[in-house]
Structure formats: C-alpha cells, structure tokens
Amino acid sequence: MSVVGVDFGALNTVIAVARNRGVDVITNEVSNRATPSLVGFGPKSRYIGEPAKTQEISNLKNTVGCLKRLAGRTLDDPDVAIEQQFISATLVDVNGEVGAEVTYLGEKRKFSATELIAMFMSKIKQTTQAEVKVAVQELVLSVPAWFTDKQRRSILDAAEIAGLRPLRLINDTTAAALGWGITKLDLPGPEEKPRRVAFVDVGYSNYTCSIVEFKKGELSVKSTACDRHFGGRNFDKALLDHLHKEFLGKYKIDIFTNPKAVCRVLAAAEKLKKILSANQQAPLNIESLMNDIDVRAMITRQEFEAMVEPLLAKVHVPLEQALADAKLTKDDIDIIEVVGGGSRVPSVKERIQAFFGKQLSFTMNQDEAIARGCAFSCAILSPVFKVRDFQVQDIINYPIEFTWEKDADIPDEDTSLVVFNKGNVLPSTKILTFYRKQPFDLEARYTNPEELPGKTSPFIGRFSIKGVHATEGPEDFMICKLKARINIHGILNVESAYYVEDQEVEEEVKDENGDVVMEGDKPKTRKVKKQVRKGELPVVSATPSLDPAAKNAAIEREQAMIMEDKLVADTEEKKNELETYIYDLRNKLDDQYADLASEEEKEKIRAKLMEVEDWLYDEGDDATKAVYVAKIEEIRALAGPVVQRYFDKVEAERQALQEKLEAEKAAKKAEEEARKAKEAAEKAAQEGAKDDEMTDADAPKPVVEEA
C-alpha cells in the first residue's frame, strides 16, 4: 500500500509520497515537481496535466482550469462568474451542477465539474503509480478550509470515480501545520503553555490564515479565516488590466477581443510578477501578439505595487478575523509561518509582517508544504506505515442546524436546533433525542447562509427516520436517538438511529469519594430509571452526493475515456516507431548493411521505404495502431534477410573475437603455468643444493695419523 498526499491546487497540483523514512515530492512525466491542474479535450483524446498546458493556447476553448473552484457549484453562483474570467472554456449547467462545454472527439460534449475533477484525479493516480510502481488507491487530499459540505462531497465523488479512496480531506493550512509540527522535537509538554503558530497561506486563488496551538504529539486548530478571491492570479489580473490599457493606447490593439492574446499576455504577466519579486523593474516583450504587432513594456516594482494596492489593502482582514475567532492578540502568537506561491510578492510579506510586528518564518517549502503535510496525514491514518503518533484536531467553520416539523402531540416543541457551532472540534458527534409516534424527517442546513461562499445553498441533507410507531405505554411515544456526525472529511451525515425505553434498574450507591456504600456484607443499591437501547431505526439520506447509479455510470464513462486515451497514445507510439524505423533502416542501408545486400535488394527496400513514407505523411497520418504495426512488419519482412546477414556477420565476428580471446587466454595460462613450473623446479634445485651443503657440514671429518 502506498502513502500518498496530494495538494490539489487551482493552478498546479503537487504529489508527495511517504517512503524511505521520509516524504518525497514526486515528479511527473516531464520531471516537473508540480503538475498543471488542467484538463483539455481534442479530436482524438484528452490532454491532462502537462499535455493540456502545452496545448492550452492553441486549444483554449477546450481547456478547463481552476477545477477545484468549480466543485459543488451551480452556474448561477456569482463566484462561478468570477471563475469564468480565469477559465477559457465555456461554463454551462450540467444537471444542476456547473460544468464545461467542449468539443471532444469531434462533437460537442458537456462535462460536470465532478467529472472534470475525476479526469484530473485519474491523471494524478497514473503519475503516482508510475513513480511508486504499485497500485494507488488510498490518499489524503487537501481542500480549502472554506469548502462547504457540498463541495467536499463533490471532491470525494470525483476521487471515487477515478478509483481512489481518500482517507481524509484535510484543510490546506491544517496540512501545512501538520507538516510543520510532526517533525518538531521541542514542542511544549501537556502541562505547559502551548506554542501558538499563525499559518498564512497565500495561494494562487485564495488566502487563508489559521491559528494553531501545538503541544507534544498534537495540534489543535483554534481558528481559520479566508479571503476566497485573493491570490496570485489576482495580481496577474491586475497586471493584465494595466497592459490591456497600455497596449490599447500605444499600439491600438484590444487584447480582450482575442482570447489567445489574453492568454499570452496573462502568461507574460505571471513571469513579470515573478521577476519583480526579485528586481526593481522588469521588461515585457511579446512578438506578433495581434495583427502581426510586436509589443513591449517596462514595469517597475513601484508601479506594480500601485496596481495591486486594492489587494494589499485587504491583507490584514483574514489575519484580524483569525485572531478574533481564536480570542487571541498579536502578542499571543509565537511564530508566523508563511507558505504559498503568492507570498513571494515582497509587498504581501511586508504587509503581513507589519500587521504582526514580528519577523516572518519561511522554514517550509512554500510550494510543497501542503502536499508533505497531506502525506504525513496519510501515513498516520495508514495501518501499514509506522509514524510518530500525532493528533490532529481541526474545527468546523460554519454552524449547522437541524430543522423539523413540529409534532402535533407536542405543541411547545422547538422546530430547529443548532447542533454544531462554529469552532467545534472536527470530527464531531452529537446525539439528538426525539419523541415520536410515526416516521419523521429532519433537514440539515447551514445556520448563517450569508457566511457561505458565493450563492451556495444552505441545504446539506434531508434524513428520513423510518420504523417509528406508537408504543404500548402511558405516553405511547417512541424515544428516538439520532447519531449526527461530521466526519474526518468535514461532511455531515446522520450515521444511525435507534430507539430506547425507560427501565428501572438497580444501581450501586456510592459515597462522595466514589466508594461503594455497603449494607452489611452487600453493596447498598437503589432503583433508578435508565434508558436502554432496544433496537435500530432505518435512516434514508438525501444528500448532494452522487447516487450509486450515477456514480457507476460516471465510472464507466471515465474508464472508457482512459482506454480511448491509451489507444491513442499507443497508436501515436507505433506511428513514431514506424517513422523512426524508416529513417534508421535507410541510413543503415548505406552504412552497416552496405556490403551485405545486393543493389537489387537495396533498391527494393528503398522503394518500399519511400512508398511507406509517402503513405505515412499522406493518408497514413491518421491510421489505426494495427495498420502501423502491419506496415512495420511489411518492411521487416522485406529487409529481414539483409538484417539477418548483418546479425550473422556480427555473431561470426563476436565468435571469432571470443575464440581469439579464449586462445590468448589459454596461451597466457599455459605460459603462466610453465613459468610457475620453472620457478618451482629452480626453487627445488636450490633447496636440494642447500640440503647437500648441510649434509657435508654434519659429516665426521677424516683423522690423519703419522706413520
């Protein structure tokens, strides 16, 4: 099982994997550490991620970006109108959900936001599997803290359509906080004052501040505040608007009448912004922008800051709100940790620092911090990965109430109740009690619709409690208990319902110290009424999630498109293989194969190559995979004898070389053995001579006597 964390961004998506006792950010097929969050459609297949970015300018009307900001939205939402400014494809209604109308496989098609996100998730899955070499199903996904129940359900549905099972949808800044805290060994103990950190995330499309308290082995989010329309793209848009006016006056061209020109200027504006983050001025040059006109401009940092002053004037708002919700002051904050690509703009950093009156901290990778935090979260939740135990306690950002119809038998009954308040711990469970004689319905909705993003409906879900009936008793009410839970994803459900009965039971009497009071040798008891669980009640839920039939149909469509994409990719690969084979064989006929084929054979092969090449660049440009394979086999069949002669020649040369080497090796071995034998003989002779000398020295000397 893999341990994967995904920072699903509006501009780019970053994938992190926990492995080798650490967390690695993986690269995509072109070795980039971030994959463009784009889905494009063409006449033969889809372009997702890097291919979509490559094709974007030439395929504007069929390329969809800002995918996550469309999740769970409707076409009439004011926020969707804002998103249309940043999305080149046409946004339309698709069965009550916003989607895009594109031309795919030569015909007009509509895809919902959930389907578009599922397509991108399939790409993320493929990229991850190519890196980790195992099947990927479970992961942790990041979402903005301001996402509602409906938006979170849309992301979950999309992931399931792509064959993924998110273990958690984690808020962006919570993921960053987890990545920051889990590696710290000096966090305060349970009885000490917590370390308070403000995590400020200035991303491509939104700006978030979370106040988080850390203690050893745990983090607790105290508050989160957001500006949904403050990010890097808004700075790019300010530059775009300025350049539009400048080009209109200087070159008499209106780029807003040409979508491709807008796209090119927007890309140039993004580069300008990055250059101005490190320099006092930056040039802009675009060749043949419109009507064969080359445009030039020079922007200073001072001019840029004047353009974005309306944005800079709002920097303090989420910071103030986060502190107010946490009931803290600036002095209570120990560290201000800043992440997100948008935070590289110097004036943004200056405003944040001026607000807190403290130095900012940049100890985390601004582009990858959230993905790493997601990977850590996945490791904690994974049963197969051992990681330091670290508790993550997030909060609910919008209060939720339940409403119901008044029971005729209970005239003074309330008809609504705020069950989950803003700031409650997430996940969270509450038990609701109802006295009923017949089945009844409840509706869950957000208490303050004006706090929700755009024109989001406050409706969360409708829950019907079945199996309720009058009982045989003096009051004849059934006591119904409902278990309402906001789960780890931040999604509300009535998980179960059951009924209880009041019964008298014997209970031991305890004194003020908690010890059982004795009566003689037996514990003293008393009769008390307690509610005893007697049985389950069926719950029928109606929520914005896709129903099983719709989800299965979406899964089938996605799998069919994946197979179509694969067939197109395989066909293109075979086409390239055929083209390469033609060039390669033609060159070899004049090189390696020159002496191995007769002129007649060469002419036949050259003629065949010319014929196939002409076909390839004419009617064969759009052939099927099988046809390309057949053409390759035709050429191989004709050139086979020549190629075989070359292989035979190479093999003969290899064998001759091998025999030569073996002969040289044998000769060398014999020479070595002869040398060793000679040395051994000489050594033996020397030892024999030495032994003779020793023998002579030990022999008795002759005695000479006088006559």
UniProtKB/Swiss-Prot annotation:
Presence of keyword Lyase: no
Subcellular localization, as worded in the UniProt entry: Cytoplasm
Coiled-coil region list: none
Induction entry: By heat shock.
UniProt xrefs under Pfam families: HSP70
Amino acid composition bias (Basic and acidic residues), ranges on this chain: 662-692
Database matches in InterPro entries: ATPase_NBD (IPR043129), Heat_shock_70_CS (IPR018181), HSP70_C_sf (IPR029048), HSP70_peptide-bd_sf (IPR029047), Hsp_70_fam (IPR013126)
Modification note: The N-terminus is blocked.
GO biological processes: protein folding
UniProt keyword annotations, A-Z: ATP-binding, Cytoplasm, Nucleotide-binding, Stress response
Annotated PROSITE patterns: HSP70_3
Domain of life: Eukaryota
Annotated region (Disordered), positions in chain: 662-707
Record-level Gene Ontology MF annotations: adenyl-nucleotide exchange factor activity; ATP binding; ATP-dependent protein folding chaperone
Entry GO terms, CC: cytosol; nucleus
Quaternary context: Binds hsp30 independent of temperature or substrate.
Family as reported in the entry's similarity comment: Belongs to the heat shock protein 70 family.
Name the record gives this protein: Heat shock protein hsp88
